[in-house]
A protein has these predicted regions:
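Positively charged n-region of N-terminal signal peptides that target proteins for export
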Residues: 1-4, 19-20
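Predominantly the C-terminal beta-signal and adjacent terminal strand-loop region
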Residues: 35-39, 150-151, 156-211
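Residues that define the transmembrane beta-barrel architecture of outer-membrane proteins
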Residues: 20, 51-59, 99-105, 119, ...
Length: 211
């Protein structure tokens, strides 16, 4: 896992040199665990919801499209992400807690439909590819490692859609507020039990233009 993390950092930092904007995002994930078994419908005997932290650092590369009314209102972003997908549940007899942390690479296209010197409003669509960095489940006072659970580990792909508002902080700096919705798919889970993370994400960010 350390080798994967180091490789992602090298690739990301290597591209920053040639980019025009670098960004840092942090926020909250509000996640709902959806579980179903092969050949059946969704099975969630208990609501499994929770919140966790989200972090992303990356680069934004302008894409010039001649048919668009303004220059550089389409951007390609690539970033290294760290997301927590947590949940809690329980009944009269038992308490359940899941804590999981995933490291990944996120690619997205961001289109600014309102763009001025002071304000930038944009829609966003992309995909996050991640793998489990850490995870455990607690049932009452007993804790279990999730790293060997097929519904949690492996290759997780999460298509996402969102909105972003950005305003000028200085001549080359910006503050941003964003909302993203994603639903995960585990590409390597061949068991009968399937788990998806349905996540509403709120993020705050800062970005700087590089020349």
């Amino acid at each position: 896992m350390k080798k994967i993390t180091l490789l992602l950092l090298i690739l990301l930092l290597g591209n920053i040199v040639h980019s025009q904007e670098i960004y840092f995002l942090t926020g909250k994930n509000y996640t709902n665990y959806k579980i179903h078994y092969k050949g059946t419908g969704t099975v969630n005997a208990l609501d499994k919801k929770g919140e966790g932290d989200s972090y992303e650092m990356g680069i934004a590369i302008p894409i010039k499209v001649q048919r668009l009314a303004f220059d550089n209102n389409l951007n390609y972003t690539v970033g290294l992400t760290l997301n927590q997908y947590n949940a809690e549940s329980g009944d009269l007899a038992n308490n359940y807690t899941w804590k999981s942390e995933y490291i990944g690479l996120q690619n997205a296209l961001v289109y600014s439909f309102v763009k001025s010197n002071l304000l930038d409003l944009a829609v966003k669509g992309g995909v996050n590819v991640s793998t489990l960095l850490y995870g455990n489940q607690t049932i009452n006072n007993s804790r279990f490692n999730l790293s060997n659970q097929k519904d949690f580990n492996g290759l997780i792909v999460s298509p996402l859609f969102g909105l972003q508002a950005k305003c000028n902080l200085s001549e080359y700096g910006y503050l941003s507020l964003g909302y993203n919705y994603s639903r995960s798919i585990n590409l390597t889970n061949d068991s009968d039990k399937k788990l998806s993370f349905l996540t509403n994400q709120i993020v705050f960010g800062i970005s700087f233009e590089l020349y």
